[in-house]
């Protein structure tokens, strides 16, 4: 939302020297990507401090920079910076030609969040927040897609779901948007409460609870408690949309004073899927049942877990006035989010790129999806699953054994704890091999994958398993004639959709 700096300063109780009549056309915390006219917030992250890059942001055209008082000198509007090429700590004043300057606050991250909350309140329209251990992004994308059949929807980009990303997404709200859909992530208790206080959702969607982030939690029950914070944060006239098939999430509506809508495959679910038919890499078809109404849905996303994600979208769509038929119809051209179940081809080999993140429950769901696709061989390339805490080794063993028992042909474990998956898979009698990196995985795939194979790539974000796919693709293309190379490059661009 565009705002004059005078109003921004008022909202943030900021002082300093800057052009109060100037209009901020956007907001950024990254000096590398900032565009002219945007307001730069010098926030401190885990590895970098934005105050070290104020000068670069202003040189790139930032209309002003929001800096904390401790970084500002007592006179004028000078910032203590590590100015590039000057060596050591240097005092550099902001450029004056465009009246760019410094907006001074006590805490820059808090200021970013306060401004985001203020913009959200000025916008004053319905906002849907999605959380859960798995499926947040796909569910959010599905909700935005369904709602876009009638409304102008603002959605968070990718997984901008933390204390930095969520405020930046809210600051992009514009008067023309009718509704917004965001996701809320967490790794500690209290984080979803804090994010909800910024976003102020009217509708809260919880997808599931699974053993993730156990490095920071003592039990799955504690994870459930953290996810429940979204429901606690909803207003009494809000709506909780809950996975009725999840043993934890299904209980979240018991004490909620607002409206509760459950979805899933169980007979007690209010938005229910019946007669589910797996269509392999083409997705699935199923009946969506709401009361006495029934509509047949076609969903071009692989895996039964995506049936659940799409049911949440149907439920939210109907809560916003769409008919069952309208909501179900919108699912037919839903495209997968980046690195989340994207189907690509390398020659006559089918690859399911689901390597954005992983946990035992999510891996099991994708292996189930893999088993619905006809193949000469089914190969699972599984990277280690991070943040599982003391139970990490045991969970990798269990995942390796259960993956093998589903009937796959080969398991390749990538990095770290994935070695325990490989050992368990071998103990179950299938071919399994451990590699130390995505690069080694790419070499194995280039050498061993054959026509007719279907390959699943699944790993935690930190493994960066997408590198294996990129290297494998490049290797396959480099061995083809020029005309074929151009064709393959076009074919392998993932088909995703934005709203």
Label each region the model flagged.
Residues 77-78, 441-448:
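Short amphipathic alpha-helix with an adjacent loop that forms part of the alpha/beta core around
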Residues 1-112, 373, 401-402, 406-416, ...:
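N-terminal leader/targeting and accessory segments in enzymes
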Residues 11, 68-73, 81-82, 92, ...:
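Acidic, Mg2+-coordinating active-site environments of NTP-dependent enzymes
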Residues 89-91, 97, 104, 108-244, ...:
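Phosphate-binding loop of NTP-binding sites
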Residues 8, 38, 57, 115, ...:
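Residue-level signal for inorganic ion chemistry
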Residues 130, 147, 338-342, 363, ...:
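ATP-dependent carboxylate/acyl-activation modules
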Residues 45-48, 337-339, 355-430, 434, ...:
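Active-site beta-alpha connecting loops in nucleotide-dependent enzymes
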Residues 102-107, 432-441:
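Short acidic-hydrophobic, aromatic-tinged amphipathic segments that line or gate anion-handling sites
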């Amino acid at each position: 939302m565009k705002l004059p700096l005078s109003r921004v300063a008022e909202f943030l109780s900021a002082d300093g020297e800057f052009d109060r009549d100037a209009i901020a056309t956007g907001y950024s915390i990254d000096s590398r990507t900032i565009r002219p006219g945007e307001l730069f917030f010098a926030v401190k992250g885990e590895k970098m401090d934005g105050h070290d890059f104020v000068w670069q942001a202003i040189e790139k055209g930032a209309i002003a920079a929001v800096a904390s008082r401790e970084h500002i000198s007592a006179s004028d509007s000078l910032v203590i910076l590590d100015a590039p090429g000057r060596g050591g700590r240097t005092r550099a004043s902001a450029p004056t030609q465009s009246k760019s300057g410094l907006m001074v606050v006590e805490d820059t991250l808090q200021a970013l969040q306060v401004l985001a909350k203020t913009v959200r309140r000025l916008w004053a329209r319905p906002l849907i927040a999605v959380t859960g251990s798995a499926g947040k992004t796909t569910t959010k994308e599905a909700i935005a897609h369904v709602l876009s059949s009638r409304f102008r929807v603002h959605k968070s980009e990718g997984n901008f779901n933390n204390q930095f990303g969520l405020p930046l997404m809210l600051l992009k709200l514009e008067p023309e948007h009718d509704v917004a859909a965001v996701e809320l992530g967490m790794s500690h208790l209290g984080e979803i409460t804090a994010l909800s206080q910024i976003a102020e959702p009217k509708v809260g969607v919880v997808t599931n609870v699974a053993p993730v982030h156990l490095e920071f939690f003592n039990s799955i029950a504690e994870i459930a408690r953290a996810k429940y914070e979204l429901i606690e944060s909803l207003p009494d006239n809000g709506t909780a949309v809950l996975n009725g098939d999840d043993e934890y999430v299904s209980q979240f509506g018991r004490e909620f004073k607002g409206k509760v809508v459950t979805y899933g495959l169980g007979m007690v679910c209010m938005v229910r899927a019946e007669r589910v038919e797996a269509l392999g890499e083409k997705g699935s078809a199923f009946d969506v049942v709401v009361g006495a109404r029934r509509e047949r849905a076609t969903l071009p996303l692989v895996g039964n877990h995506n049936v659940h994600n799409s049911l949440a979208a149907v439920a939210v769509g109907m809560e916003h006035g769409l008919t069952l038929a309208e909501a179900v119809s919108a699912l037919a051209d839903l495209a997968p989010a980046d690195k989340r179940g994207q189907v690509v081809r390398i020659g006559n080999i089918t690859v399911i790129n689901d390597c954005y993140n992983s946990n035992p429950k999510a891996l099991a769901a994708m292996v189930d999806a893999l088993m619905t696709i006809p193949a000469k061989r089914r190969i699972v390339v599984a990277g280690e699953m991070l943040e599982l805490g003391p139970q990490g080794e045991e969970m990798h063993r269990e995942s390796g054994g259960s993956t093998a028992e589903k009937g796959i042909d080969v398991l390749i474990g990538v990095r770290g704890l994935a070695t325990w998956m490989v050992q368990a898979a071998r103990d179950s009698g299938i071919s399994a091999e451990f590699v130390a990196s995505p690069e080694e995985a790419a070499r194995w795939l280039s050498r061993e994958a054959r026509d007719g194979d279907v390959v699943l790539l699944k790993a935690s974000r930190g493994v960066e398993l997408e590198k294996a796919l990129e290297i494998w693709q490049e290797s396959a293309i480099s061995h083809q004639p020029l005309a074929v190379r151009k064709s393959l490059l076009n074919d392998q661009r993932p088909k995703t959709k934005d709203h």
